Amino acid sequence: MRYFIFLFVAMLTFSNWASAQQKQEPWAKSQLMETATLASRITNNKTKDLLILSVGPDAIIKGSVDIGPANNQENIKKLNSYLKNVSKDKKIVIYCGCCPFDKCPNIRPAFNTLKEMGFKNAKLLNLPKNIKADWLDKDYPTND
Amino acid sequence: MKRTIFLLLIMLFSGYLFAQNSTLKVGENAPEIALPKVDGTAFSLSSLKGRIVLIDFWATWCAPCVKEQPELKALYEKYANSVKNGKFEILGVSLDKSKENWQKTIERFKIDWLQVSDLKFWKSPVAKDYGIEGLPFNVLIDEQGKIIAINLHGKELEELVHKYLNVEK
């Protein structure tokens, strides 16, 4: 019995800890956009109201704007000035894809900048592994 | 019934074989790499036959790759004699997009081993030829261009390089 109580407490503690870890990310789960969603919007020419910004090594996604790696302060300035006159209601999706989310140095500063600037419809493209595995290998549309 | 199971097993197994075909295997010949160096001159991996070669796939946008460069430098310096005697070489293959970033990082880390890139990012044919799914990634090949090891890093990599260079002396 004691063992079970111990297990129960351990599980509770751990799950709290795990969710606390998740909460530290600047985005909520609902702010992740799935790749299939974006790919189908691009393919069907439904991106007029959407701004796709690359904050990583290369703007490889079709129709995306190359801001540059956001771990560089210069590129954060670039992001700021690019979005200066954009309506705060504009739908924006950012992506990097250099590496898995936990190792990526670019998405956090970029997403935080969007939040600080007050964009209400900012999303992060869900590329859990990288742009190669999660976009190119699926033959989703690219800038050539 | 037995036959069905047997057939199913064969199907499973062939699927496995097929999946394996798309990636590299130890003992196989390393695919040719023919890419330009920083100065734009042509280079091919086959010109390094006769040496143990560490092919380091990296990019300046890959933080763990950049972090590994000083380790590679230490390895290159440790075996400087083998390099001089034509026994060992490192070939850096960059998946960069920006030549400026590539060049700057080479200068910053004073990388003096071979560096090649077509600056095509993930669209570089080498990424496909070597079945690279993510960086950092490397391949160690022997004097005949056969693959000795895939994706070893740190101490494990150094020990293997050491072993091969000593045996061949």
Q: Can you name each region flagged by the protein language model?
A:
Chain B
Residues 67-92, 107, 166-168:
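Conserved helix-turn-beta segment immediately C-terminal to the redox Cys motif
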Residues 49-50, 57-74:
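Conserved redox-active cysteine motifs that mediate thiol-disulfide chemistry
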Residues 84-99, 111-121:
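Thiol-based oxidoreductase modules, predominantly thioredoxin-like and allied folds used
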Residues 103-139, 143:
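Short, internal strand/loop/helix patches
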Residues 20-46, 166-167:
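N-terminal "domain-start" segment that seeds a small globular fold
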Residues 1-23, 168:
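Bacterial Sec-dependent N-terminal signal peptides
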Residues 135, 140-169:
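Thiol-/selenol-based redox modules, centered on thioredoxin-like
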Residues 52-53, 136:
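Alpha/beta-hydrolase fold active-site loops
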